[in-house]
Regions:
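Conserved nucleotide-ligand handling architecture
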Residues: 1-136
Length: 136
């Protein structure tokens, strides 16, 4: 039968069907927030970085998006689980420290959005089909 999951933001929705369990999150790349404060509060808490001064908004959005996809994969709660997820850019891996969950993820940048998929498979997903209702 497969698994169906979805994510939405103010002007887009993503639906994903896959044979295995999968999580997805979408957010706008122009989202307005203080990315440094956000990163200090929610991310990099396990490996405090000396290079927080060059963290870009895009880097934080990608991390946020991947972690949200992992939380959705686990059917977790954002407020409860966000501090337990570790994000690794290379290899593209997400680890829940408390539950010892290891996931892989893929990032897709599409027009004004960044999209992340979280899954157990070892191979990365290729975005084979993206359907839009607008011409870009």
């Amino acid at each position: 039968m497969g698994n169906l999951t979805f994510s939405n933001c103010k002007d887009a929705i993503n639906l994903v069907w896959h044979k295995s369990k999968i999580g997805i999150h979408i957010t706008r790349t122009d989202r307005d927030f203080n990315h440094i404060k956000f990163a200090e509060k929610y991310f990099f808490h396990t490996n405090k970085s000396n290079h927080n001064n060059y963290l870009t908004k895009n880097m934080i959005l990608n991390q946020w998006c991947a972690v949200e996809a992992a939380i959705k994969w686990d059917h977790g709660k954002l407020a409860k689980d966000i501090n337990h997820w570790q994000y690794f850019e290379k290899p593209k891996e997400l680890i829940h420290k408390k539950k010892n969950i290891h996931l892989n993820y893929s990032q897709i940048n599409f027009h004004n959005w960044t999209i992340a998929l979280a899954y157990e498979e070892k191979t990365s997903f290729n975005p084979e089909i993206i359907c839009c209702s607008k011409n870009f």
